[in-house]
Structures are given as structure tokens and as C-alpha cells.
From Swiss-Prot:
Protein name: Histidinol dehydrogenase
Alphabetized PROSITE patterns for the sequence: HISOL_DEHYDROGENASE
InterPro entries tied to this protein: Ald_DH/histidinol_DH, Histidinol_DH_CS, Histidinol_DH_monofunct, Hstdl_DH
Family: Belongs to the histidinol dehydrogenase family.
One Pfam family it belongs to: Histidinol_dh
Annotated disulfide bonds: none
Residues in coiled coil: none
Binding site for Zn(2+): Q262, H265, D363, H422
Source organism: Colwellia psychrerythraea (strain 34H / ATCC BAA-681)
Length: 434
């Protein structure tokens, strides 16, 4: 269970840092070496290594890596109407919100004869990594696939570990089809990321890879982003987390449910409650104990709760300060004066306002993206959006008159920096025909 209540007012600066400390991410030299070995095998042996590693780690001997269009068609027939409707509804919701993010080119004439343009273009090829654990994750397919589709990436490749029969879940294939993804491969783990970075006989390399994964996948993404020229990753990955700010009028059952919904993700997940009401905190603690027994993943949630926090603050203003310092992945506000708090909150991956806005809605169907910065990265990294699937570059066009108007400035600054060739690139143009 969660450790006893923490009174923020009574903590020293060092104790406050400890109270907000996140679970340590294992940094193993052995892991690094193991992943480096996998990457080397894929780089040098291509498909042969992929098939061998899949048999080694997934226990399945595959004859092919590609998923056929016939398999996708069969998946549509295999799912119930109810399951299909849910996937389509989530797709529609996510597409609706993300469609509004489409960027337009910006052109400014900074001075007469000097035109500057900011252009946005889709990344040409992207890879989407979809984990496969105890259940399929079609929501992750949609959260990654919809932005890629709307941005207009020329190639979108999906990789996912095969099940014990060498297949991908029907939900994965249906969600991928909705997003217009036709390149689908049954490969997972570090070897999948290596295939996307280096390319193999079957899987062409991509420019950028997206998606969560275990520590082998995370390590592979990190190593490859540093080794392969032009290969990028989405964002640093860490354990899932949620922070709730609540006042005395909040519903303790709702709060407990929200905290447990994150705790069940993994034993390294962290959940935090900040409140100015000791009575509410006590009620939430009781609710957690009661609801925990109802969960199929209660053992996992129970482990996560050991590194979680129930914090009593002087007032809600102090709760906001603590939240901004922590910078949670998910931030839930359940207070009567939520708009006032919202205006002061700066660091969060995604914010959920009001009693009827569970974090689960954002995970699946509200329309926002559930790929969010964790481990405090919300202070510097944004939630996933169309911007992550595109890149921007500038274009400038200058007339002779425009260059003449800038010449004095450029000549003086190049003189200050001692860059004669830069200066001459300007003067030679103005001397011509003068």
C-alpha cells in the first residue's frame, strides 16, 4: 500500500526532493552489452538475424516477417461488431483532434525585398513500435498511426512482436488498416528497432521510430539514435505516472480509481495525490485498499503503490507548486476552482480537468494523444502531435535592393566576427554592375 501521509509543510528541502523522487531506471552495463550484440547481429545478418532472434526470444520459428493483406482482411471478419465499433470510435475521436494540428507555411517580408518562409514537411518514413504483452494495444496503434497518416508520411511501417502462433492480434491489424498502414511486420524487441534503423532485406530503414517498449527496446532506441546518421527517436521513455490535485469536495472513490489505473501499468509506476484536505486523503487511502482487491493486476498495483505518495499541502496553491516541480506525465485536477489552478500549471504531459475526466479517457478515446513525456521530461518535451511526424525548414529569397538594405548590418557583424568570406559573399554581389 501507499506509505503514510506526508505533510509537505514539515519537510526539509532534502526531504521534499526525496518525496518527489521517481523510481530508479535500471542502468545496466550488461543490458547495454546485450542490446549492442543484438543490434550488431541485425546490422550484419539482416533477416537471418531477425528470424533467429525471434525464435530465441519469442519462441516462434517464422517463415516470413510480413503480414499480408489477406491476414488484415481476415482480422476484420474475426472481431465482434462491438470491438470493431470501439476501434472505429477511438480512431474518429483521435483523428478529429489531431486534424486541427495541421501546420501551415508562414511567410514574412522582414524588410522590403527580403522574404522569409517557414515550411513544414512530413518526415518521409516512420516506424511504429507496438508492444505485445498480456493483451493487444490497438490504442497505441491509433495514437501513433493517426498522426503519421494526417501528416502525410510517405511510408509508415508497423512492427509488433508475434504471439505464440506467430500472428499479430486482430485488433492491431484492424487499427493499422484504419490508419492506412500497409507495411506490417511480425518482429519485436531490440531487433525490431535495429531493423527499422539499419534496414534488412525485407524491412527498409526509416527516418524516425515511435512507440513504447521494455528496457531492451528503450536501450536499442537510445543506442541507435546515437549511432545511425539521420535516425531519430520520439522521446525518452520512463515508467508511467499520474499526479492528482484534489480538494475536500472531490470524490475519493474517483481519485482512488484514477490512482490505481496508473499503478496497474507496472511495478515501477508512480502515483501521487496532493490535497489540502487530510480528511479526503484518509478517505482515498481507504478507497484504494477496497478497490485494489477488485483488480486482476492487484499484485502489480500493490507493488507500485509502495513508491507512491499521499501528500498534504498547506493549500491548493502549494499543491500547484509541487506539481510544477514534479512535472507529471498525467495530471488530474479535481477541485471546485479548477480553471484558476489550470492557469498556473505549467509542467505536465496531459491534464485532465473535472470529476468526469478520468485519465483512461485520454488513453483511449477523448482525442488527445496518450504518448506523453515521463520522468520529469514534461518540463521540456511536449505530448506527441503532428509536429513530431514533420520537420520544419526555412526558405529565404532576397532581391538586390533587399540585400543592399541589409549590407551595412551584415558587413559590420562579419567584420566583428572576422569572417571575411562571409562579408565578401555580400559585397561581391553589390559590386557587380555598380
Amino acid at each position: 500500500m501507499i506509505n503514510q501521509l506526508i505533510n509537505w509543510q514539515e519537510l526539509s528541502p532534502q526531504q521534499k526532493n526525496s518525496a518527489l523522487a521517481r523510481p530508479a531506471i535500471a542502468d545496466s552495463a550488461l543490458l547495454s552489452t546485450q542490446v549492442a550484440n543484438i543490434l550488431s547481429q541485425v546490422k550484419n545478418q539482416g533477416d537471418k538475424a531477425i528470424l533467429a532472434l525471434t525464435e530465441q526470444f519469442d519462441g516462434i520459428a517464422l517463415s516470413t516477417l510480413s503480414v499480408s493483406s489477406a491476414q488484415v482482411a481476415q482480422a476484420k471478419l474475426a472481431l465482434t461488431d462491438k470491438r470493431l465499433k470501439a476501434i472505429h470510435t477511438a480512431y474518429k475521436q483521435i483523428k478529429s483532434f489531431h486534424s486541427a494540428q495541421t501546420a501551415s507555411d508562414i511567410t514574412v517580408e522582414t524588410t522590403p525585398g527580403v522574404k522569409c518562409t517557414l515550411k513544414t514537411e512530413a518526415i518521409e518514413s516512420v516506424g511504429l513500435y507496438i508492444p505485445a504483452g498480456s493483451a493487444p494495444l490497438p490504442s497505441t496503434v491509433l495514437m501513433l498511426g493517426v498522426p503519421a497518416q494526417l501528416t502525410g508520411c510517405q511510408r509508415t511501417v508497423l512492427v509488433c512482436p508475434p504471439d505464440k502462433n506467430g500472428q499479430l492480434a486482430d485488433e492491431i491489424l484492424v487499427a493499422a488498416d484504419l490508419c492506412g498502414i500497409t507495411e506490417i511486420y511480425t518482429v519485436g524487441g531490440a531487433q525490431a528497432i535495429a531493423a527499422l534503423a539499419y534496414g534488412t532485406e525485407t524491412i527498409p530503414a526509416v527516418n524516425k521510430v515511435f512507440g513504447p517498449g521494455n528496457r531492451y527496446v528503450t536501450e536499442a532506441k537510445t543506442q541507435l539514435s546515437q549511432q545511425v546518421a539521420g535516425f531519430a527517436i520520439d522521446m525518452p521513455a520512463g515508467p508511467s505516472e499520474v499526479l492528482v490535485i484534489a480538494d475536500g469536495q472531490a470524490n475519493p472513490a474517483f481519485i482512488a480509481a484514477d490512482l490505481l489505473s496508473q499503478a496497474e501499468h507496472g511495478v515501477d509506476s508512480q502515483v501521487i495525490l496532493l490535497s489540502d484536505s487530510e480528511s479526503l486523503i484518509s478517505k482515498v487511502s481507504t478507497e484504494i485498499a477496497q478497490q485494489l482487491t477488485l483488480l486482476s493486476r492487484c499484485k502489480i498495483a500493490e507493488q507500485a503503490l509502495k513508491q507512491s505518495r499521499l501528500i498534504l499541502t498547506k493549500d491548493l496553491a502549494q499543491a500547484v507548486e509541487v506539481s510544477n516541480e514534479y512535472g507529471p506525465e498525467h495530471l488530474i485536477i479535481q477541485t471546485e476552482d479548477a480553471p484558476t489552478l489550470l492557469s498556473k500549471l505549467r509542467n505536465a504531459g496531459s491534464i485532465f480537468v473535472g470529476a468526469y475526466t478520468p485519465e483512461s479517457a485520454g488513453d483511449y478515446a477523448s482525442g488527445t494523444n496518450h504518448v506523453l513525456p515521463t520522468y520529469g521530461y514534461s518540463k521540456v518535451i511536449s505530448s506527441l502531435s503532428l509536429a513530431d511526424f514533420s520537420r520544419r525548414f526555412t526558405v529565404q529569397e532576397i532581391t538586390k535592393a533587399g540585400l543592399q538594405s541589409l549590407a551595412e548590418c551584415i558587413i559590420e557583424l562579419t567584420d566583428a566576427e572576422g569572417l571575411d568570406a562571409h562579408q565578401r559573399a555580400v559585397t561581391i554581389r553589390l559590386e557587380e554592375g555598380s
